[in-house]
Every structure is written in structure tokens, then in C-alpha cells.
Design a protein with these regions (language model features):
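Cys-dependent protein tyrosine phosphatase-like superfamily
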Residues: 1-108, 121-173
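Short cysteine clusters
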Residues: 112
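Substrate/cofactor-recognition hotspot
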Residues: 115
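Conserved lysine of the Walker
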Residues: 118
Length: 173
């Protein structure tokens, strides 16, 4: 089943024509997906006006930062998350604080390697904490973009359903 989910998510096209797997618009200024190549970064800038990137890959990938900045991304940020362990609440809050600036600081794109597990979990957190979605609705979106529990990813889902409390991540005005 997980292999089918993965293959399906890799093959779907997005309406923006941005050549990035699992690419989608979250809000008018927040986008999500997999690790872009050069064409992906150009597409982000040219097709949807992204100017900032937040990489959530566990270890900073210098080549990714260089690729993004060379393509014209004006700000690249790294906040490390594991794709096998429950996220640290402080890191989740840091990520939320950063993406919540997209309306005032410029459109942004957040990504992990495949745009499924870390990205899916954090976008689900955002959907529940800021958009009023239920956890079930947010998990449905995770599934749409290729979520699967196999290969050690189950702790992320367990954290989301059993430990994540949206009240702990509310936006402070």
C-alpha cells in the first residue's frame, strides 16, 4: 500500500506547473513540497512568486541552499526535523513562527526530501492550529501527498494524533 501511495504522489502534476514532486499551495503565500532542483527553484520564483524557503531536512544541505540562492530565492532558512522521530515542540513552534510571517515577509516554500513525512506532518499541524481543520482532515491531506507509515515514519503520525495539542501552538497576537 505504501508503495502505491508513494508512486501516486510522485506522478501527480500540480496546476501551477512547478516541477517539484508533492508541490501544493497551502495558503495564498505558503507552498509545500519535496526538495527542489534548479528548475524547481526557478519555477517557485517565476510561477508562484516564492522568495523565501524553509528547509526542514534533518541535516542542512549546503548544495540546496546554494541552489536556492543562485536561482534568486532571497532568504533560505533551515530548521532540522527527523523523518523518524516525533518533532521537538520548540522546533515546531519555531517553524510555525517562521511560516506565519509569509503574509508580511513574502511568499515561502517549505520542504523536506520527499514532501511527504516531515512536510506533511508540519503542514497538518499548521492546518489544525491555524486553519481550523480537524486532525482527520489534515491527515487526509497528508495521505494525498504520499504519506505512509512504513520504513520508520509511524512516530510522526503517532505524535500528531496522540501528543500534538493545537492549543500548545496557537498564534500569539
Amino acid at each position: 500500500v505504501w508503495l502505491i501511495q508513494w508512486a501516486k504522489s510522485r506522478s501527480e502534476q500540480n496546476p501551477f506547473g512547478v516541477p517539484i514532486p508533492n508541490f501544493a499551495q497551502v495558503t495564498k503565500t505558503i507552498y509545500r513540497g519535496a526538495l527542489p532542483d534548479e528548475a524547481g527553484y526557478r519555477g517557485l520564483i517565476e510561477k508562484v512568486g516564492v522568495v523565501r524557503v524553509c528547509s526542514i531536512i534533518e541535516h542542512e544541505v549546503r548544495a540546496d541552499k546554494e541552489r536556492a540562492l543562485a536561482a534568486g530565492i532571497t532568504e533560505w532558512r533551515h530548521i532540522a526535523f527527523s523523518d523518524r522521530d516525533a518533532p521537538a515542540p520548540a522546533r515546531v513552534r519555531e517553524w510555525l513562527a517562521y511560516i506565519r510571517t509569509s503574509d508580511t515577509q513574502g511568499a515561502l516554500f517549505t520542504h523536506c526530501r520527499g514532501g511527504r513525512h516531515r512536510t506533511g506532518t508540519l503542514i497538518a499541524v499548521y492546518r489544525v492550529a491555524d486553519c481550523g481543520w480537524t486532525k482527520e482532515q489534515a491527515f487526509g491531506e497528508m495521505m494525498k501527498y504520499g504519506w505512509y507509515d512504513a520504513l520508520g515514519h509511524r512516530p510522526l503520525r503517532d505524535w500528531f494524533f496522540h501528543e500534538f495539542d493545537p492549543k500548545d501552538y496557537e498564534q500569539k497576537n
